[in-house]
Amino acid sequence: MGSKITDKKRKSRDSESESDDELANGLFDGILSQSEDEEDYLPSDDDDDVEDSENEGTGASEDDDDDDDDDDILSDDIPSDVDSEEAINRLVKQQEELEITEPGVDPKREEDDGADRNYRIEKDANGGERYVYDEIDPVYDSDDSDAKGPVNTIGDIPLSFYDSYPHIGYDINGKKIMRPATGDALQSLLDSIEVPKGWTGLTDVDTGNPLNLTQDELELVRRVQMGLLPTDLQDPYPDTVEYFTSIEEKMPLSSAPEPKRRFLPSKNEAKQIMKLVRAIREGRILPYKPPEEREREEEEQEEVHFDLWQNEEPQAPNPMHIPAPKLAPPGYDLSYNPPEEYLPSKEEREEWENADPEDREKEYLPQKHNALRKVPAWGNLVKERFERCMDLYLAPRIRKNRLNIDPNSLLPKLPSPSELKPFPTVAQTIFRGHEGRVRSVSVDPTGVALATGGDDGTVRVWELLTGRQVWSVKLNSEEPVNAVRWRPTKDAFVLAAAAGEDIFLMVPTHASVTPALDQASRDILATGFGYATNGQQPAAPVSKEPAAKWARPGTKLEDEGVLIRITVRSTVKVINWHRRGDHFATVSPTGQRSSVAIHTLSKHLTQIPFRKLSGLAQTAAFHPLRPLFFVATQRTIRCYDLQKLELVKVVQPGAKWISSFDIHPGGDNLIVGSYDKRLLWHDLDLSNRPYKTMRFHGQAIRQVRYHRGGLPLFADASDDGSLQIFHGKVPNDQLENPTIVPVKMLKGHKVVSKLGVLDIDWHPREPWCVSAGADGTARLWM
């Protein structure tokens, strides 16, 4: 029997090991329900006894089989026949109970749960089992779906009283509410980085736990921030119900009798009529008279004439008469009852009396009297009057003529604006089509097409004179187009646009673009790819990140005319071309060291010329004649020589924040616009300081631009929604100063979100300018 039991236990152990392997492999994951109690699966005392006996039996059998050659075995280690028979009886009894009960049902569990069951089993009409559930007791604890946790019931007592205790208060049952555990500094840092849903950063003063918002509370906050109603159950715009017009009422709304005031004379009107009657009787109100009778009465009245100058006496003119100067008004010390601080002390009185009359500061001493009637006569009155007459007689007096100068005469004489024509005066064409702000405009070198870029991520090309849109492409659906600039030469029709961190080079299709011009433009853009494949581009170190990536934008954009995409490290805000069209500069104000980049079109090469800038770069431009490069930071403009690679000049406009600048086509003058509402003219040969500062706007100046076609015009664009046109003539003689005359202020753009006119550009030949506004329009001024 011992060996049989041992074999059975070994088989059971093998089966248990196999089941353990299957659970480890995840074959039975999730079979047990979470609602089952863990106590039902704990081993009972009987099972422990069986297992102990089995273990003892198994150990004995193994010792008998394996240790045949060992020493004698103690009698206590050998199992007795009685113990083995009792163990066998228990196993047989348990096996019978398992066979009787249904599989998966624990009889002990049913007996234990019988007292807690909320139902009873009855027989139905067919003899089957029917479950009858108890009535639900509608007490407060029965519905605990919205029940809150333990509430701190300490009342209006500060939690600082419990700082020295491990608990923070008591719940409604009088049990202690323990203080919540707090993490270390690392855990606090991780909690601040990984913010859970509904996190507010606040702590509940009652419990000390973090105070989080539920999903309903977050939805309520979101709706309040968006200006919506707190719930969706209310209709903010219900349909109007016409109660008195839509339904024909057959019965009167009110059957009250007619009020008495409808058929009785008004007492108030009777009082007003009596006032008029009394005024007529007293003659204060005259009856109406015809105009003829009124004129006849006026003619009958005699007119009284008298001489104003009847008693006037002639006086001899005395132009040399000068009135005497007035005496100084008396002070507080001349009062009959002066303040105490004006009265002299005993020492001061003795000092004044002992001094000579010529050495005294005053000819009198202040005295105090209780009443004005007690003031005696002034003994020095005759002496003072005599000395005053002597001063008027002997002291020379002259008449001084004041200079009455007209302030306008001090201003320089400027020519009349009518003599300085032509310049733009009216809005000729309005270009509408962008959604949101129009951030940049540019007129092509031929003066036929206009390119615009806006917040909707599109670039649009228009006919300048007609305002008709001829071409458009969407570059980015998330980022706005911050800058658009045409290539300055006429041998190609190439447009550069910046959207986010990408710069796109494209060839728009237009009626004025011939097939030869279109092919020449595409060849110029495709030259760089061949250059890169020939290996002529200098090899960059492998460890360094390239300054920019030149690639094709994709089939969709290539079909629309976009041929090259240049990806840089940060958002591009400014694009400016070199006069020859092979180089262009981009500025990314947030790019730090790589904020300014120079791109070579023929080589597909991008260079970062500066290792470090003393400030945030705002804009950059090439000199129109010489190999100079200008970079503007927030307060200064630096001029670099590209051949010698050195700093040439630092221009200091004195502005708080420079927004834009432009170089005169002659190359010797510079205009600067700033966010502090100032327009500054610099003469580069004269000084680093501004030659003239002009303040004509009430808001920030966004853009300034010279006319490139030889006309002495320049303009600025401001956030107040206006453009100021100036006549700026630069003489050929170095001894003469430039002539700057404001000639016209153009208004038409609307101010949206405190933004007005964002960009401006001139026609290459005509005195026309184009502006871009935050109201979503571009305007042609002629």
Swiss-Prot record:
GO terms for cellular component: nucleoplasm; PeBoW complex; preribosome, large subunit precursor. Residues 105-123 have a biased composition (Basic and acidic residues). The keyword RNA-binding does not apply. PROSITE patterns: WD_REPEATS_1 (PS00678), WD_REPEATS_2 (PS50082), WD_REPEATS_REGION (PS50294). Coiled coil: none annotated. One of its GO terms (biological process) is maturation of 5.8S rRNA from tricistronic rRNA transcript (SSU-rRNA, 5.8S rRNA, LSU-rRNA). Keywords: Nucleus, Repeat, Ribosome biogenesis, rRNA processing, WD repeat. It is found in: Nucleus, Nucleolus; Nucleus, Nucleoplasm. GO terms for molecular function: large ribosomal subunit rRNA binding; ribonucleoprotein complex binding. Residues 35-86 have a biased composition (Acidic residues). Belongs to the WD repeat BOP1/ERB1 family. Component of the NOP7 complex, composed of ERB1, NOP7 and YTM1. The complex is held together by ERB1, which interacts with NOP7 via its N-terminal domain and with YTM1 via a high-affinity interaction between the seven-bladed beta-propeller domains of the 2 proteins. The NOP7 complex associates with the 66S pre-ribosome. Component of the NOP7 complex, which is required for maturation of the 25S and 5.8S ribosomal RNAs and formation of the 60S ribosome. This is Ribosome biogenesis protein ERB1. It comes from Chaetomium globosum (strain ATCC 6205 / CBS 148.51 / DSM 1962 / NBRC 6347 / NRRL 1970).
